[in-house]
Amino acid sequence: LMEDYVVYHLTGVRQIDYSLATRTMAFDISSLTWSREIFEAAEIDVSKMSAPVPTGTDAGKILESAAEEIGLSPDCHVISVSHDQVAAAVGAGVFDSSVAVDGAGTVECVTPVFDAMPDVDVMYNGYFSIVPYVIPGKYVAYAFSYTGGALMQWCTDTLAKKEKELAKEAGCSVNE
């Protein structure tokens, strides 16, 4: 995935956050390891995969060559972070099952936190993914609506025509 690719090129370390490893559908969310069963069925050598790590794991200092090329201090550390919806939940202060976060962007996503592993059969039958959260033993699920960004664009184009025109005249975005 993109995260571990970037981390590897910046540090030489192959690691990936649990929440992003989950996006491969080949990650066992119970054991927090790659699923040998899936890799064997697909005839893929699991050793080619980056090591799954908790969100916030330090991959170490940036390689001197990378630091020089992109203008960062060679003392800069590279940290594996999470899927954007997990980051949104953390940023919104959602740390237990009493609340959820609703993020709108390319998609709209409601992200509730579960204080323990939810019933996987119920979740999977509803087409919800279950993802390890930043707090050990907690999980999140993603309830996606793929019209998120498209709906916002439709509203701007249809309901905010005048505002869009005024923003264009002012040389700014209607979203500012």
Residue ranges and their predicted role:
Residues E43-P54:
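A conserved helix-loop-beta module that forms one wall/lid of the active-site cleft
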Residues T57-D58:
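Glycine-rich, mobile lid/loop segments that gate access to catalytic sites or pores
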Residues K61:
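Extracytoplasmic/periplasmic/luminal assembly and interaction segments
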Residues L1-M2, V7-Q15, L20, M25-R36, ...:
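Active-site core segments that coordinate phosphate-bearing ligands/cofactors
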